[in-house]
């Protein structure tokens, strides 16, 4: 799963370049393309910015290691896609698109944290489709997600649309 690669960045945990790097590393080991499935998250990470630079939208996060390796996931907290979208709607937050990782994110203010800025990093149907298209065009066996219960299970029109959009991009 590409999103489990160690890093200490306040960036997407499953950016396009990371997907490409991960796939290439398996291919360089001689793993056949038709045996690989690209794993993608249906969740995201919430990071508390210990310092936030608005001029270049950089969120400096706490330096945390996991099993001896730098790990941004350990510095953040995982949230479901349903939670991420609900918070975005509830607080009327505008999503930002990061071109070099092909992923969305957003910032919001929380007065209970040191700098006050929280950054939420996640994938949405558009970013997932870009990565899935990459996998399929490369000739991989497929793409999968973790995990299906990250979506809103209710019968609301919004939840039904959310599920249709997310499942709609899967191969």
What is the meaning of each model-derived region?
Residues 71-139:
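Hydrophobic, secondary-structure "cap" segments at the distal end of domains
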Residues 1, 141-146:
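Short acidic catalytic loops
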Residues 1-86:
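Substrate-binding surface in catalytic domains of secreted glycosidases
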Residues 134, 149-171:
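Aromatic-rich peripheral "rim/lid" segments of glycoside hydrolase catalytic domains that contact
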Residues 9-13, 115-123, 144-149:
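Active-site rim elements
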Residues 38, 135, 143:
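Conserved, mostly hydrophobic/aromatic
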Residues 18-21, 127, 159:
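Acidic, Ser/Thr-rich intrinsically disordered and amphipathic helical segments
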């Amino acid at each position: 799963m590409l999103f489990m690669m160690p890093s200490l960045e306040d960036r997407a945990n499953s950016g396009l370049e990371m997907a490409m790097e991960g796939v290439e590393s398996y291919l360089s080991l001689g793993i056949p393309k038709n045996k690989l499935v690209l794993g993608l998250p249906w969740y995201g990470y919430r990071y508390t910015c210990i310092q936030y630079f608005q001029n270049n939208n950089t969120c400096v996060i706490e330096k945390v290691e996991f099993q001896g390796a730098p790990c941004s996931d350990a510095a953040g907290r995982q949230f479901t896609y349903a939670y991420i979208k609900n918070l975005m709607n509830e607080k009327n937050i505008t999503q930002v698109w990061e071109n070099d990782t092909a992923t969305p994110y957003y910032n919001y203010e929380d007065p209970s944290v040191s700098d006050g800025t929280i950054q939420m990093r996640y994938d949405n149907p558009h970013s997932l489709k870009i990565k899935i298209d990459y996998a399929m065009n490369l000739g991989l066996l497929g793409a999968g997600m973790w995990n299906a219960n990250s979506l809103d299970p209710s019968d609301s029109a919004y939840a039904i649309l959310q599920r249709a959009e997310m499942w709609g991009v899967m191969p």
